[in-house]
Each structure stands twice: as C-alpha cells, then as structure tokens.
A protein has these predicted regions:
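NAD(P)+-binding Rossmann beta1-loop-alpha1 motif at the extreme N-terminus of oxidoreductases
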Residues: 1-62, 86, 122
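Rossmann-fold NAD(P) dinucleotide-binding segment
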Residues: 50-112
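Hydrophobic residues within alpha-helices
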Residues: 15-16, 35, 102, 147, ...
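Hydrophobic beta-strand scaffold residues
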Residues: 26, 46, 112-114, 155, ...
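Rossmann-fold dinucleotide-binding core
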Residues: 72-74, 93-174
C-alpha cells in the first residue's frame, strides 16, 4: 500500500520503520525535518508538506496532541485534495471532543476516518508489538488491516464511532497511571520500614500483579533513571483529557484528579522531560525519602 505517515517522534519512527520493513510505500512528513532522516535512510520518501502524505491509499497521523493534529490536518486543509478512497488513520491520543470534531470534518470531506490509538512504549513500537485500539467504519478498518498487522501484534475493535477508541485509550492510560502511582506509594511505604523496595517489587510482579504494566513500570521506579519513553507532560495531558471525558458524561474520576495533581507536582520540581514513572519521586518526597532509589 502507498501510505503517508505524519509525526516521527519516538513512537512514530518505529511505526514508520515497521511499515517500510513490511514493503509498504511510505511517504513521511514531520514538522522538523531531522527525525525523518532515519526513516528516509530506511527507504521512506520525504514530503515537503502534510498534504504530500495524503496522496495514496492511506495516511497515518501520529502526533502529540489535539493542537498538533489540528495544525497539520485542519490548518493545512489536507483533506480537500486527498483522494476520496483514502483512509485517514489517526493514532494519536486525543480529547474526545476533538475526536468528535474530526469525525465531522472527515464526513464533510468525504474521507474515511479511523481512530486507532496504540498501547506500548517506543521499544514496543520498534518491535511491531503494539496493541491497536481501533474504532470506525468496519470496511475502512479492514482496508487498513495490512498496516495494522505491520505495526502491531493485535488490533482490538472497539466500536463504529471513531471517538470510542479515544475513550478506551484514555481509560487505559488512566488505569496505567493509577498503577504507577500505587506502586510508587507502596515502594515508599516499604522503604520507610526498611524493606528493600526491589524485593517488594519482585514479590508484586511475581504473584498477584504478574502483568507487563507492573513489571515494566516497577522496574523503572526501582532503577530511578526515568529516561523518557512517555514524558510526564504527556501523562498530564492524558489525565486532563480523561477527566474532561468523565465530566462530559457525568462520570467522576477522583483518583485521576490525584494522579493529575501529582504529575503537576513532579513537573513543578523540574521533572517535565522525564518518563511519567518519575511521578514516583513525588511519593518519595512526601515520605521524606531522598532522591530516586538507585541514585542514593
């Protein structure tokens, strides 16, 4: 398939490379040109504008937030000249309100639109092992299936209205953030009682919580380096979006408010550029523990 790819951040580079490796014809655009150099060396075609990525069978958008998608897609009016049989696949984590707006914009333009946010960190994207949360017209999803198969290990169908996939992603990210917060607090409690937090995490991930989320983020909390795979600022964005989605439907999310406030606390202490698991430092400060575990 001829596919455009917009957004070559930490996730997008790995995803675009997987498409190239699967022998799709990939045309890329990124606001700053430097990130595209790696995928161009691998065989992608560099485009000079977002519209250049909207000339084939499909176009994938993997940008950071509502504003970035709005600027690249609506601001550049790329749908006006796109082929009518093109499928636009938005894989960004967006607000529900903006996802609904995109539904209307695409319907007016006569362009098929799928929301397909993903689960997984950059290393998972590079390995082609993402989980894809897809919603939209079933026929359009089937047309996109070869692309999803190249990028992910499984595609989960969550509804016929694209914004349903965005709601699912926000719910999952809220749950993941809650798990990180709970592990951080549990580790701080154990350490104050002179229990080795690494040993506690070994028990946690080897018994009742033997799941990838706990294993991955438990390890990051214990190592204490917090190299960014998913930045604190993006985690804060997603908690705000989850709270807004809940408010719109009268669904309280009190723990999301706690996590949001702790992410704000971490950013206020200079950790904005670190992985969102660095929220563990907030629990440590409040427990009167110094620094990160391995940095002591």
């Amino acid at each position: 398939m001829k596919v455009g790819f917009i957004g070559l951040g930490a996730m997008g580079r790995g995803m675009a490379t997987r498409l190239i490796d699967a022998r799709h014809e990939v045309h890329v655009w990124n606001r700053s040109p430097e990130p595209s150099e790696e995928v161009v060396r691998r065989g992608a075609h560099r485009e000079e504008s977002p519209g250049g990525a909207f000339t084939g069978d499909a176009a994938i958008t993997m940008l950071a937030d509502d504003d970035a998608v709005r600027a690249a897609i609506i601001g550049r009016d790329v749908l006006r000249t796109a082929p009518k049989d093109l499928v636009h696949i938005v894989m960004s984590t967006l607000s529900v309100a903006f996802a609904r707006e995109l539904e209307q914009v695409h319907a007016k333009a006569g362009i098929a639109y799928i929301a397909a946010p993903v689960m997984g960190r950059p290393d998972v994207a590079a390995a082609g092992k993402l989980n894809i949360l897809a919603a939209g017209d079933p026929a359009a999803i089937e047309r996109a299936r070869p692309l999803f198969d190249a990028i992910g290990q499984r595609t989960w169908l969550l509804g016929v209205e694209p914004h349903q996939a965005n709601v699912a992603k926000l719910a999952i990210n809220f749950l993941l953030a809650s798990a990180i917060e709970a592990m951080a607090e549990a580790a701080a409690l154990a350490e104050r009682y002179e229990i080795d937090p690494a040993k506690l995490m070994e028990v946690i991930t080897g018994t009742l919580f033997a799941a990838p989320a706990y294993a991955t983020y438990g390890k990051l909390i214990i190592e204490g380096e917090f190299k960014p795979g998913f930045k604190l600022t993006l985690g804060l964005k997603d908690m705000r979006l989850a709270l807004a989605a809940g408010e719109a439907m009268g669904v309280p999310l009190p723990f999301a408010s706690v996590v949001r406030d702790n992410l704000v606390d971490a950013i206020g202490h200079g950790d904005a550029g670190r992985d969102w698991s660095a929220v563990a430092l907030v629990a440590r400060r409040r427990a009167a523990l110094r620094g990160a575990l391995r940095q002591q």
